[in-house]
């Protein structure tokens, strides 16, 4: 039983949970990952990995080269691509480039990554298999730091020394341990669509506008329409789009922050009507219209943020729970840094555990939480605020985008 209680229990098999598990496993520290969903769950949209996130992960995995990550996760990896993006913002009503970095002097520091591929790549970065148990939805947590029990809805119970809450923005662990911490809904409309086209159609309809970039970002008058590659092969291209805008008054029919999960998969007629009035340029015009959406999988996304105080983090640690990922620093997807901070969380928490274990032969769990939060708390909470501000700036009026574009031209 003593050995079992030294096991670390990780709730959630997302990026943060798997990163932590992989690094602990590589260092011989027993851990189990519990995931509520089934192994075939799909979350195949792409995210932007920044240098501060992936460099820490590559170093922790034994100084792996960036090329290893790119070959494993880039949306265009199967056709020899590198996950490159041009970082340009285009007027989605004319196609004109409004803002773009000088790519002749800028090295690639951002890598687009397919989320499913990233999870698989992390899992495969070690000789020993990770112990991931699917179909385990957390019900409650019992005990205290050093001797804690996770109870699941399937009646399974597991004892461990520490629980790592990697169960996302709607974290069950957080809602029990810190019921006062409630995700904050941002007043924005956000719809996400997924679809597939043939590679030849992609070359005809999108490639002339995007070039080799894995994302084509369109900005309008307080609304955005990014079009992104999720996965590309020689025959098929899986893409997604987002339509996001600020809320229009108190009675905005499309603003439904508490919509039930099943209803969130339905396309409201008001969205179709709105898209048809946007006067979009190509290629957005071809895909974001009422007729095209009939063949797409469309989801309503509520953008939420999570803030946790240092006292909250300390209190949770005393009860045997440490947070990683969106469970304690959820931030906007478009313009956010969430995936990168999830990687850093996993790296920094694993390092705190490994260091503690090496110095004492077993985990000094008080020091683990203290050392981890010593750097991670400010880093991640600052990122939530920064990302939220950036999210609103990316939904600015068209007149402001024009002013920014003209100023850039003047300085060029």
Swiss-Prot record:
Pathway stated in the Swiss-Prot or TrEMBL entry: Secondary metabolite biosynthesis
Pfam family, one: FAD_binding_3
Disulfide bond entries: none
EC class (word): oxidoreductase
Cofactor (UniProt): FAD
GO MF annotation terms: FAD binding; monooxygenase activity
Binding site for FAD: 35, 46, 119, 326, 339
Signal peptide (UniProt feature, chain positions): 1-21
Enzyme Commission (EC) number: 1.-.-.-
Glycan-modified residues: 92, 170, 231
Record's keyword terms, sorted: FAD, Flavoprotein, Glycoprotein, Monooxygenase, Oxidoreductase, Signal
PANTHER family assigned to the protein according to its UniProt record, in alphabetical order: FAD-DEPENDENT MONOOXYGENASE APTC (PTHR47178:SF4), MONOOXYGENASE, FAD-BINDING (PTHR47178)
Function field: FAD-dependent monooxygenase; part of the gene cluster that mediates the biosynthesis of neosartoricin B, a prenylated anthracenone that probably exhibits T-cell antiproliferative activity, suggestive of a physiological role as an immunosuppressive agent. The non-reducing polyketide synthase nscA probably synthesizes and cyclizes the decaketide backbone. The hydrolase nscB then mediates the product release through hydrolysis followed by spontaneous decarboxylation. The prenyltransferase nscD catalyzes the addition of the dimethylallyl group to the aromatic C5.
Family: Belongs to the paxM FAD-dependent monooxygenase family.
Protein name per the record: FAD-dependent monooxygenase nscC
Gene for this chain: nscC
């Amino acid at each position: 039983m003593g050995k079992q209680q030294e096991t670390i229990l990780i709730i959630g098999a997302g990026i943060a949970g798997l990163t932590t598990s992989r690094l602990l496993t590589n260092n011989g520290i027993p851990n189990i990952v519990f995931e509520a969903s089934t192994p075939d769950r799909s979350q195949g949209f792409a995210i932007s990995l920044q240098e501060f996130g992936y460099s820490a992960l590559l170093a922790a995995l034994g100084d792996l080269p960036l090329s290893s990550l790119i070959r494993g996760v880039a949306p265009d990896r199967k056709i020899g691509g590198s996950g490159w993006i041009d970082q340009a913002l285009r007027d989605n009503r004319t196609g004109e480039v409004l803002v773009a970095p000088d790519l002749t002097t800028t090295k690639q520091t951002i890598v687009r990554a397919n989320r499913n591929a990233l999870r698989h790549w992390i899992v495969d970065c070690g000789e020993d298999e990770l112990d991931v148990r699917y179909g385990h939805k957390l019900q409650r947590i019992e005990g205290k730091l050093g001797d804690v029990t996770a109870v699941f809805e399937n009646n399974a119970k597991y004892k461990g020394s520490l629980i790592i809450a990697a169960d996302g923005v709607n974290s069950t662990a957080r809602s029990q341990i810190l019921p006062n911490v409630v995700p904050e809904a941002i007043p924005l409309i956000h719809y996400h669509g997924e679809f597939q086209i043939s590679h030849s159609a992609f070359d005809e309809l999108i490639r002339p506008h995007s070039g080799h970039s894995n994302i084509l970002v369109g900005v309008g008058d307080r609304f955005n329409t990014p079009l992104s590659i999720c996965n590309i092969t020689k025959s098929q291209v899986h893409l997604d789009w987002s339509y996001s805008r600020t809320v229009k008054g108190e009675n905005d029919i499309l603003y439904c922050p508490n919509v039930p999960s099943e209803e969130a998969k339905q396309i409201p007629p008001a969205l179709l009507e709105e898209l048809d009035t946007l006067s979009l340029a190509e290629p957005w015009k071809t895909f974001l219209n009422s007729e095209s959406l009939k063949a797409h999988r469309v989801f309503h996304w509520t953008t939420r943020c999570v803030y946790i105080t240092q006292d909250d983090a300390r209190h949770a640690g005393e009860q045997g729970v440490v947070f990683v990922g969106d469970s304690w620093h959820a931030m906007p997807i478009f313009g956010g840094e969430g995936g990168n901070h999830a990687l850093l969380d996993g790296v920094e928490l694993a390092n705190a555990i490994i260091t503690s274990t090496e110095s004492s032969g077993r985990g000094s769990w008080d020091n683990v939480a203290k050392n981890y939060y010593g750097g991670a708390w400010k880093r991640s909470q600052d990122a939530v605020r920064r990302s939220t501000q950036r999210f609103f700036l990316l939904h600015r009026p068209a007149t402001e985008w024009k002013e920014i574009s003209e100023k850039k031209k003047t300085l060029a």
